[in-house]
């Protein structure tokens, strides 16, 4: 006898019933439309960049990509999602705020989805599961919020953040902050800063992040025995600020360091280590040698 399906789409064994999901011809929520328009607009601005080229604007775009990407990896990912180190609130909050300008959502939404990803990695309930195809795990999942709720349920895995007023404030006002930022870009540098700066920088930041969800579960090498398809992709490590050592990350989720070997570039870890030396980052978590020996593929 088949297990009954619950309202969240799961049966009593916790598995989601598998069905072919249409990407375009489906019911779209307002959240889906807003996300899709944001992604489309950023790519459109990037396509306009050659017609509004200014070197200083393009240089700003590269800097914007680097800083917002680092804010995502440092704040949203390793600090908030995995609690791999602690920061004083006067530092934690501004870093989380700056990550908003990466256009990847507010902290509550980003952290919840990422925690679900680790809870249900490579299964039907993974929010951006690679088993549904490269393009789904790369980008399509972003614009299907009802499917995420259907698979994972509500945002009940971020109670630690929900208890803090600042993250509720960002969630309720994120649209204002993003529009304010892009308005300032235009007022400061006109179309060149919107296209070469925001457009080019935004597109690079988008796809570098998305490749961790897609490519790093398909191609690359494995150093650790994990129950998923995570891979280490060395050539992405510089661009992702160290996030592409993805097999390392899935083996030791709470580790503040993902480039576990000396030669594995991990810019996010270098910043965490600097903050630790300065006394700003505390309780920095790293895997023990015993943990490494248990999961190592080669000894």
From Swiss-Prot:
Keyword Ion transport: no
GO cellular component: endoplasmic reticulum; endoplasmic reticulum membrane
Motif (Histidine box-3): 246-250
Keyword set, alphabetical order: Endoplasmic reticulum, Fatty acid biosynthesis, Fatty acid metabolism, Iron, Lipid biosynthesis, Lipid metabolism, Membrane, Oxidoreductase, Transmembrane, Transmembrane helix
The keyword Membrane is annotated on this UniProt entry: yes
GO terms for MF: acyl-CoA desaturase activity
Pathway in which the depicted protein is active: Lipid metabolism; polyunsaturated fatty acid biosynthesis
EC number(s) on file: 1.14.19.-
Chain location of the short sequence motif Histidine box-2 per the record: 114-118
Entry superkingdom: Eukaryota
Top-tier EC class: oxidoreductase
Membrane topology (UniProt): Multi-pass membrane protein
Transmembrane residue ranges: 31-51, 55-75, 174-194, 199-219
Main location: endoplasmic reticulum
Annotated compartments: Endoplasmic reticulum membrane
Cofactor: Fe cation
Positions of short motif Histidine box-1: 77-82
GO terms of biological process kind: unsaturated fatty acid biosynthetic process; wax biosynthetic process
Entry domain remark: The histidine box domains may contain the active site and/or be involved in metal ion binding.
Entries under PANTHER family matching the protein: ACYL-COA DESATURASE (PTHR11351), DELTA-9 DESATURASE-LIKE 4 PROTEIN-RELATED (PTHR11351:SF66)
Similarity comment: family membership: Belongs to the fatty acid desaturase type 1 family.
Protein name: Delta-9 desaturase-like 5 protein
């Amino acid at each position: 006898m088949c297990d009954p399906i619950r309202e969240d789409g799961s049966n009593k064994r916790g598995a989601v019933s598998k069905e072919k999901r249409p990407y375009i011809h489906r019911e779209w929520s307002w959240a889906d439309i807003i996300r899709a328009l944001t992604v489309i607009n950023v790519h459109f601005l990037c396509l306009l960049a050659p017609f509004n080229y200014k070197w200083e604007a393009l240089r700003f775009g590269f800097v914007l990509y680097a800083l917002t990407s680092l804010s995502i990896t440092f704040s949203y990912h390793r600090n908030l999602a995995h609690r791999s180190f602690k920061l004083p609130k006067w530092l934690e909050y501004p870093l989380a705020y700056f990550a908003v300008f990466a256009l990847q959502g507010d902290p509550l939404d980003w952290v919840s989805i990422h925690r679900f990803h680790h809870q249900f990695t490579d299964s039907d309930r993974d929010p951006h599961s690679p088993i549904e195809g490269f393009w789904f795990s790369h980008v399509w999942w972003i614009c299907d919020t009802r499917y995420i709720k259907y698979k994972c349920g509500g945002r009940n895995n971020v109670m630690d953040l929900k208890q803090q007023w600042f993250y509720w404030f960002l969630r309720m006002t994120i649209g204002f902050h993003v529009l304010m930022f892009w308005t300032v870009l235009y007022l400061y540098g006109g179309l060149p800063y919107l296209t070469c700066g925001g457009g080019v920088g935004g597109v690079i930041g988008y796809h570098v992040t998305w490749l961790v969800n897609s490519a790093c579960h398909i191609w690359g090498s494995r150093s650790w025995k994990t129950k998923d398809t995570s891979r280490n992709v060395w050539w992405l490590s510089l661009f992702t600020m160290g996030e592409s050592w993805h097999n390392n990350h899935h083996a030791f989720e709470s580790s503040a360091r993902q480039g576990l070997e000396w030669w594995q570039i991990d810019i996010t870890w270098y910043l965490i280590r600097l903050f630790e030396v300065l006394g700003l980052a505390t309780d920095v978590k790293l895997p023990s040698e015993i943990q490494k020996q248990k999961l190592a593929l080669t000894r």
